[in-house]
């Protein structure tokens, strides 16, 4: 019988597994705390479980782990981690320091199938989904080295295209017996998979970020093929329907591209589009990269766009580019570090 990777289980699933072994369900909480609060890497580390029970677990289950194969540091303090998976594929995570908090950007897929024109990861194509264990092990590995305050699913892949495993990881991240992250500290970003947005909202409580990036279907169809399946009207309706706890907002991510979506007319349309959605806007100046003809917006167009939103009482920040010198900035993850390691 093939052993199960115990890190693929949520607490509820682990309780069922332990009960199936003829043991008390509360043992699952003990194991969970060892895995995610004590970073136990072997059952032998779990000293409040009997030796016999630990030996029984080893017969049917195992504990997966990831260690960074390479770490690249940016001049601004950002760090990019390369993780080699058991099948030889690789994913990247990015740790972004910011005064009193650090944010870890994690991957949910090897590659991505969304094909967004401005995103380097999209040229990598989709190889496969990550398992729940492979997602949470990115967090385990980085937390061994650095404190992590916030988690964002904004690395490689479309999280909602791997909904089951992402939801499993979210439950582990926010479980009081797991990583203990506040749901306010965990954000899932999507390019706009409308049915899965509803499923996510019904499954877990987390922050939602929506990669909007255009104010007309014509432009969004061109730069984000997913819009042909779920156009703006459907996407914005899904945003409005997404269940939010009090005093929470959906983050509208808007990658500004010169001559494509950075005009004042775009700013005016954006205000109208999100007027009835509890939201805040993140303006993200496009990060130029090889193989893409798009250009970064001018500072003048960024400033005017930002000011227009502020004047219309929209909560807005312009995100500074972090880690661009190590290809760790928004839209730049594509395994450059993996290639460097192999070479």
From Swiss-Prot:
Function, in words: Specifically methylates position 2 of adenine 2503 in 23S rRNA and position 2 of adenine 37 in tRNAs. m2A2503 modification seems to play a crucial role in the proofreading step occurring at the peptidyl transferase center and thus would serve to optimize ribosomal fidelity.
Q: Which gene encodes it?
A: rlmN
Pfam families named among the record's database cross-references: Radical_SAM, RlmN_N
The record's listing under InterPro entries reads: Aldolase_TIM (IPR013785), Methyltransferase_A (IPR040072), RlmN_N (IPR048641), RNA_MTrfase_RlmN (IPR027492), rRNA_lsu_MTrfase_RlmN/Cfr (IPR004383), rSAM (IPR007197)
Instruction: List, alphabetically, the PROSITE patterns matched.
Output: RADICAL_SAM
Q: Which cofactor does it need?
A: [4Fe-4S] cluster
Superkingdom per UniProt: Bacteria
Q: Quote the CDD domains the UniProt record gives.
A: Radical_SAM
| Species the sequence originates in | Geotalea uraniireducens (strain Rf4)
The taxonomy runs: Bacteria, Pseudomonadati, Thermodesulfobacteriota, Desulfuromonadia, Geobacterales
Cofactor binding comment, as recorded? Binds 1 [4Fe-4S] cluster. The cluster is coordinated with 3 cysteines and an exchangeable S-adenosyl-L-methionine.
Q: What is this protein called?
A: Dual-specificity RNA methyltransferase RlmN
């Amino acid at each position: 019988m093939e052993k199960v990777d115990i890190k693929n289980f949520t607490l509820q699933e682990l309780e069922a597994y332990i009960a199936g072994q003829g043991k008390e369900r509360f043992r699952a909480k003990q194991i969970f705390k060892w895995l995610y609060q004590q970073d136990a890497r072997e059952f032998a580390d779990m000293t409040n479980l009997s030796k016999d029970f630990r030996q029984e677990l080893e017969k049917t289950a195992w504990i997966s782990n990831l260690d960074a194969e390479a770490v690249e540091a940016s001049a601004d303090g950002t760090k990019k981690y390369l993780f080699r998976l058991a099948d030889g594929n690789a994913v990247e995570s990015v740790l972004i320091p910011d005064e009193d908090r650090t944010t870890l950007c994690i991957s949910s897929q090897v590659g991505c199938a969304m094909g967004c024109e401005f995103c380097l990861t999209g040229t990598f194509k989709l190889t496969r989904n990550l398992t729940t264990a492979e997602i949470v092990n990115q967090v385990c590995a980085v937390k061994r080295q650095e404190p992590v305050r916030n988690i964002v699913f904004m690395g490689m892949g479309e999280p909602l295209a791997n909904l089951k495993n992402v939801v499993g990881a979210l439950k582990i991240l926010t479980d009081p017996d797991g990583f203990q992250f506040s749901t306010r500290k965990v954000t899932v970003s999507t390019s706009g998979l409308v049915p899965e947005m509803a499923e996510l909202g019904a499954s877990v409580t987390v922050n939602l970020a929506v990669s909007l990036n255009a104010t007309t279907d014509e432009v969004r169809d061109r730069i984000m093929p997913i819009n042909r399946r779920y156009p703006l009207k459907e996407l914005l309706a899904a945003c409005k329907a997404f269940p939010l706890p009090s005093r929470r907002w959906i983050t509208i991510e808007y990658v500004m591209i010169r001559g494509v979506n950075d005009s004042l007319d775009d700013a005016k349309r954006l205000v109208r589009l999100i007027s009835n959605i509890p939201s805040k806007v993140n303006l993200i100046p496009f990060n130029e990269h090889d193989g893409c003809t798009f250009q970064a917006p001018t500072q003048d167009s960024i400033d005017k766009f930002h000011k227009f939103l502020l004047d219309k009482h929209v909560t807005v920040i312009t995100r500074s580019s972090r880690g661009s010198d190590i290809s760790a900035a928004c839209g730049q993850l594509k395994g450059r570090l993996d290639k460097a390691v192999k070479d």
